[in-house]
Amino acid sequence: MEETKTIKEKTIELIDALKATCQTYGMGNDGNEYKIITQVFLYKFLNDKFGYEVKKVSTALKNAEKWELAYAEMSEDDRLDIFDSLPSDIPLLNPEHLIANLWNQQAKGDFDLIFDSTMTDIADKNIDIFSTQTAQNTKIPLFEKLTQYVTDDTARAPFARALVDKLVNFSFEEAFEKHYDFFADIFEYLIKDYNTAGGGKYAEYYTPHAIATIMARLLVGNATDLHSIECYDPSAGTGTLLMALAHKIGEDKCTIFAQDISQRSNKMLKLNLILNSLVSSLDHAIQGDTLIAPYHKSDNGQELRTFDYVVSNPPFKMDFSDTRERIAAMPVRFWAGVPKVPAKKKESMAIYT
């Protein structure tokens, strides 16, 4: 328990340090700050997860003083054999993708380009599994170029160095068996500043973990014989309701389906799914308007899909005046009616009649 607490404290220190770096380079409370924080944190998590798993399948790496160096010295065939032995929810990383490799290249003048290309190369290599998508089936990769958000070109390489410098102080390896109970709190801490800051309206999309847990207990009750369960949230936000439900049911017994119009929510949801060992559900995390373009269909592709559990905490007031008539043109689906567009304060437009 004390060991986990120490790791948790170090994780919080890492998040604070990454936010401080963004502040130093002029992106504190900037609209792009959350992209940097969440993606760099996720990179650290996946790097350590990969290291943890490869040492389980390779005695040579497990016994190496520096496993990253031993991994880099392996033949390509040996590395491919390791890839074949890894669970499907583990990203495939080459030696040049590892944090240790970036650390060793920090002195190079174009380190910002090296950092960005590393992130995008990881995303490209793992896009089949580690990606979400839009309602139009466009893949949303795991990572993107991050130093582009620093306006001053000359500050981009130092910014990248400052980020990598924060990632080498500890490893998540000791905490990976804690799963939800450890990382749920971390996720809540990670996004807390973006609930009100950064130009966003995250209060509309976020449900506190404690409330989500109570809702999951009420829904599932004492049911234990649960298998192949499908859970859905049509306004998923950061996915907290779905994570609590999956934890109550059992992550290995359910599949998550989600949709939300917000690009930012989708990035947060992606992080949440990965932290909670629900990588297999990433493909079902859709960014798009649930009202006019619901993505999840039945197996025959004709009707809307039905689910075992549906949870939702939608924004009960929002401006959907642009799509109101399209929604009203679907009376079978919206049989209870569609609210009229108010003359003033469209942002307070009710979502129900």
Q: Which role fits each region the language model picked out?
A:
Residues K201-S312, K317-A328:
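Conserved S-adenosyl-L-methionine
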Residues A157, L304, K345-I351:
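Short, solvent-exposed loop/helix junctions and linker helices
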Residues A197, T255, V338-K340:
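A short, mixed-charge helix-start or loop-turn motif at secondary-structure junctions
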Residues M1-I214, L218-L219, S281:
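Non-catalytic, mostly N-terminal accessory regions of nucleic-acid modification and defense proteins
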Residues F316-A350:
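Mobile active-site "lid"/loop adjacent to the S-adenosyl-L-methionine
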Residues T207-I211, K346-T353:
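Phosphate/oxyanion-binding active-site loops and adjacent basic polyanion-contact surfaces
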